């Protein structure tokens, strides 16, 4: 260290305290990176890698330290690229003016930017939240905390029991965190860390146990959210407080600034929102499509017609967290109904919110201290629109909308304060001046006058001095040696005042200076620096004043966001001819002329065929749906699930009429794919998902099961499908509402033997050798699968299709006899060689009502093995 320059010693000391971050080290107008940081940054940012001496004596090139740099004023774009790749960036600033510093300039970390703590607009999707997550798990409980520091909103929940990790993973689906801080117990859960890194592309950090200590967690929660917030947390499960405490500790360590805007804590318990696992979210394509991972083609794409970024985020949060309270659901869809019924108010309200901007994130940046003049101008422009929004809300007669109107503060005083101080079109940077409005501050105006009219100011002084002294030939000049001076000819030498100080004698006269002239010279020469510094001082004062009103602004922003989301629901309902659903706790799902909300929008030039649905508590609880591939079975089942989910969001739904009994969870088992990275086959993935469903579903759940058992042999698959179907239908085991699509036509016989089960099929019309899918759900089971006809529609060569028909005919003729013979032969073997008693004893000993689906499958495999 003794051989290092003072600057390099300073750098290494700061780097030692931030080993996991790329250190942006401020040197003049650049952020410099050194050594391994430089190598990494040059690679990731396409920067030229150079080198410099790091000691007091010159070194050979191979011993010099690698370095690269970026202009400080362009840092946001570079930081955004690093954050997008999952890196942390520590910003080290000069803490004093280098020109005034005595010796080495003081430097320190002002903040650490991470994927979950980024606030720069360039790094963010304005229609999606950016959550940092804190997770605490021990042997009995689990807590999960989520915070978006750009808006100041925090959410917290906790779980107990053996399924606590699965519940936490499901919560991740609601928030899609960008970064997660885990205690040791959470970090040891491979399923959790795997979901974070693989499903959410989330940066994961093991925070150890130190960050999650309960006493410190309670202290931090009390400091950040107040005593009442701490008391609202469950006393019997400290995991919630510890998860939030770990998150807050991480924020305090990395942000090093005022975080007072983080003041909205929402603690929720299991049972407040519909729980959706990652499989259901993916299969229902709630926020992105399965194949392209795009918003277009998702349910969010259909529903989001919001006009503000905060409204878009609010609507998305409703989609991620459908409600379970009938009262809360009806309250929301009542507000939507009021907007649907009043076209003029709805359209004027929408117009008033158009271009209103992102008040939530604006106030976040203002409190954070990173907002510029343009942010202030944007906030002022948003405030100017608030009276029109409030006026339209006040005109509507709905309880929730009236509450929103009352919560919406027009913030006139804040808008006037900003308008008085900030010009209409401020420059990008507040470090270069030019954004304080003329007339706001006398000193700024005076300095600007000097800057704009330096010659004019000198001329004014010259005229004043001529008049005061009576020296007609007096003139003020300038040179690089003396600066400004007063020149008087010899003929007026006797009239020179005593306050003039002689500086130079010429042939025809003399040159003088005065204190007033020197002061003016100083002002002219330093006016630019002084006005920039003064403008920044005035701006920081204004920013602090507006920061003090953060809660008022946040409350109004929340009211605007909810209003925007409700208006979007209403606009979509009117445009797409949706109906207001009747939501209750009856357990009944009754839909008349239901439509798939996404498919009908994609098929712009085609008529979508609507279908009815009835699922009761006792009758028609389970629907067995048969029919050919491509006929629309999966679309129909997804349609029912989406209509239920939309209803519980508080939205209108695509149907002529709908009655929705609230469901606690929606499960889906649709399609199949190998999970090679986990070493799982298609069938294993299918069985794992089915197992999860049967273990976690309740009688109040909605199950969407498509082609269970198709990943194995026909008899094995049919046995598993039947066992699963019976388990779902039987009220003693589950009794959940289930849509069960299958190609095993033999299962349709269960309609006559399994209570609550009914058959449906997709209507098909044949025309010669061709088939036409009518897309209509009708009672009864399908008589055949039309597999070869579907293959023909898919474009298989005619020769292949004809050969398939011939093979099918042969199989039908042969197996029709051989299958019966095989059954008889098997019966004889089982009774003779193995013995009737062994098989029957095993069947007598088993208790079907207590068997899990997996145990039932294992028993079937065991008996089958004995019979072979």
Located regions from the model:
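Active-site phosphate-binding and catalytic loops of NTP-dependent enzymes
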Residues: 92, 115-124, 258, 396-400, ...
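ATPase nucleotide-binding head domains, primarily ABC-like/P-loop NTPase cores
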Residues: 35-36, 237, 307, 312, ...
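Amphipathic heptad-repeat alpha-helical coiled-coil/stalk segments that mediate oligomerization
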Residues: 209-224, 274-278, 290, 381-460, ...
């Amino acid at each position: 260290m003794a051989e290092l320059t003072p600057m390099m010693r300073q750098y290494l000391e700061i780097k030692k305290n931030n080993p996991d971050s790329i250190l942006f080290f401020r040197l003049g107008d650049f952020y410099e990176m050194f050594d391994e940081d430089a190598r990494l940054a040059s690679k990731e940012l396409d920067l030229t890698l150079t080198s410099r001496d790091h000691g007091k004596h010159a070194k050979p090139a191979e011993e010099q330290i690698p370095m690269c740099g970026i202009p400080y004023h362009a840092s946001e774009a570079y930081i955004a690229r690093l954050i997008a790749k999952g890196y942390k960036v520590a910003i080290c600033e000069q803490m004093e003016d280098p020109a005034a510093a005595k010796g080495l300039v003081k430097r320190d970390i002002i903040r650490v930017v991470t994927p979950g703590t980024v606030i720069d607009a360039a790094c963010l999707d304005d229609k999606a939240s950016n959550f940092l997550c804190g997770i605490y798990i021990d042997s009995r409980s689990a807590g999960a905390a989520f915070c978006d520091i750009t808006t100041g909103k925090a959410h917290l929940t906790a779980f107990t029991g053996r399924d606590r990790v699965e519940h936490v993973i499901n919560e991740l689906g609601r928030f899609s965190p960008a970064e997660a801080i885990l205690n040791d117990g959470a970090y040891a859960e491979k399923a959790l860390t795997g979901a974070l890194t693989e499903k959410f592309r989330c940066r994961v950090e093991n925070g150890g146990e130190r960050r999650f200590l309960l006493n410190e967690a309670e202290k931090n929660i009390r400091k950040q959210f107040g005593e009442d917030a701490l008391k609202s947390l469950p006393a019997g499960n400290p995991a919630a407080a510890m998860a939030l405490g770990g998150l807050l500790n991480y924020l305090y360590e990395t942000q090093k600034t005022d975080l007072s805007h983080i003041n909205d804590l929402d603690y929720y318990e299991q049972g407040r929102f519909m729980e959706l696992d990652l499989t259901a979210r993916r299969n229902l394509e709630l926020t992105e499509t399965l194949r392209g991972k795009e918003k277009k083609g998702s349910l969010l794409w259909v529903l989001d017609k919001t006009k503000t970024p905060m409204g878009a985020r609010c609507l998305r949060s409703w989609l991620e967290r459908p409600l379970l309270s009938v009262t809360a659901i009806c309250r929301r869809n009542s507000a939507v109904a009021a907007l649907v019924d009043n076209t003029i108010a709805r359209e004027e309200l929408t117009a008033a919110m158009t271009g209103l901007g992102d008040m939530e994130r604006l106030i976040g940046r203002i409190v954070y201290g990173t907002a510029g003049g343009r942010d202030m101008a944007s906030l002022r422009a948003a405030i100017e629109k608030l009276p029109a929004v409030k006026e339209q809300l006040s005109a509507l007669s709905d309880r929730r909308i009236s509450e929103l109107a009352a919560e919406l503060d027009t913030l006139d005083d804040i808008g006037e304060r900003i308008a008085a101080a900030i010009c209409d079109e401020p420059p990008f940077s507040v470090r270069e001046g030019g954004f304080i409005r003329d007339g706001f501050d006398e000193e700024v105006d005076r300095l600007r006058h000097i800057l704009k009219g330096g010659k004019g100011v000198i001329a004014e002084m010259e005229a004043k001095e001529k008049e005061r002294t009576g020296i007609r030939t007096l003139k003020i000049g300038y040179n690089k040696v003396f600066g400004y001076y007063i020149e008087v000819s010899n003929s007026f030498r006797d009239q020179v005042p005593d306050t003039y100080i002689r500086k130079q004698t010429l042939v025809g006269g003399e040159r003088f200076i005065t204190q007033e002239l020197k002061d003016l010279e100083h002002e002219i020469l330093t006016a630019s620096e002084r006005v920039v510094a003064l403008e920044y001082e005035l701006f920081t004062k204004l920013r602090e004043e507006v920061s003090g009103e953060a809660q008022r602004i946040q409350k109004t922003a929340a009211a605007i966001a909810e209003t925007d989301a409700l208006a979007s629901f209403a606009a979509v309902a009117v445009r797409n001819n949706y109906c207001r659903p009747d939501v209750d706790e009856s357990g009944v799902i009754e839909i008349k002329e239901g439509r798939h909300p996404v498919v009908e929008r994609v098929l712009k030039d085609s008529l979508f065929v609507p279908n009815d649905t009835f699922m009761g508590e006792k009758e028609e609880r389970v629907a067995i749906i048969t029919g050919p591939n491509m006929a629309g079975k999966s679309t129909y089942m997804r349609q029912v699930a989406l209509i239920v989910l939309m209803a519980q969001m508080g939205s209108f739904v695509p149907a002529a009429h709908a009655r929705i009994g609230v469901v606690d969870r929606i499960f889906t088992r649709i399609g199949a794919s190998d999970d090679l990275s986990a070493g799982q086959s298609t069938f294993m993935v299918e069985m794992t998902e089915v197992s999860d469903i049967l273990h976690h579903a309740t009688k109040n759940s909605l199950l969407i099961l498509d082609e269970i058992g198709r990943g194995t042999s026909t008899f094995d698959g049919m046995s598993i499908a039947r066992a699963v179907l019976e388990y779902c239908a039987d009220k003693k085991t589950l009794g959940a509402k289930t849509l069960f699509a299958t190609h095993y036509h033999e299962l349709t016989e269960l309609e006559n033997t399994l209570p609550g089960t009914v058959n449906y099929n997709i209507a098909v019309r044949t025309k010669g050798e061709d088939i036409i899918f009518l897309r209509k759900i009708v009672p009864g089971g399908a008589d055949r699968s039309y597999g070869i006809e579907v293959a023909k529609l898919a474009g298989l060569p005619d020769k292949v299709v004809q050969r398939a028909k011939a093979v099918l005919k042969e199989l039908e003729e042969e197996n029709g006899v051989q299958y019966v013979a095989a059954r008889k032969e098997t019966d004889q073997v089982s009774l003779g060689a193995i013995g009737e008693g062994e098989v029957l004893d095993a069947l007598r000993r088993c208790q079907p009502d207590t068997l899990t689906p997996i145990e039932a499958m294992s028993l079937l495999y065991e008996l089958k093995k004995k019979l072979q």
